[in-house]
Amino acid sequence: LTLPQNWQTKQVFLKLDAASKAATIYMNGRKIGEHNGGYTACTFDITPFCSFDAPNSLAIHVDNARQDIPPISADFTFFGGIYRDVWLTAVPKQHFHLTNYGSEGIFISTPQVSEEKGTILIRGEIKNDAEQKASLELEHIIYNPDGSIAQTQKQSIQIKGGELYSFRTETAR
């Protein structure tokens, strides 16, 4: 696996959309991590394991024999292996926290919905993997069904190097 040279200044993530039942990930012979559960995604920051001077070796060991991982039993056979997509992604040093349960790092819910009013809750985390502080602008835009902008909200934030910033925004309309 040869990585582009322009990825050297980025964070590199490996995401498995699903591998049943237990997966162990290795890069260049070094263990990156494990994930148990064949129905959920997992994401690993593989940046410290990447080589940009030579091709990389990526190995994913998948084991479906484990009896301690739900579902414990069923009336059918649990086939093993990687059965959904695998993604390799490079992002800037400041990014949404991608290793948060294999998500994209943003969670949107509608805790209150009626004919008169709706509430949208947006939450997540931003990670600064750089050594220095970063000044960022967090913006969310809510669109009407016709594509016009219903609401925009901006927030200026500063994140120290190596820190994780949690955000939570609730809007009502």
Describe the residue ranges of each PLM region.
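Ser/Thr- and Asn-enriched, surface-exposed coil loops between beta-strands
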Residues: Q8, G38, S114-G118, G161
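Conserved long hydrophobic alpha-helices within structured protein cores
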Residues: P55-A59, G161-E170
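Short, hydrophobic beta-strand segments
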Residues: I46-P48, R168-R173
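Beta-strand-rich binding/interaction modules
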Residues: I25-M27, E116-Q158, Y165-T169
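Accessory beta-strand-rich segments of carbohydrate-active enzymes
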Residues: L1-T99, S103-G105, D129, E139, ...
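Charge-dense, low-complexity intrinsically disordered segments
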Residues: S73, I159-G161
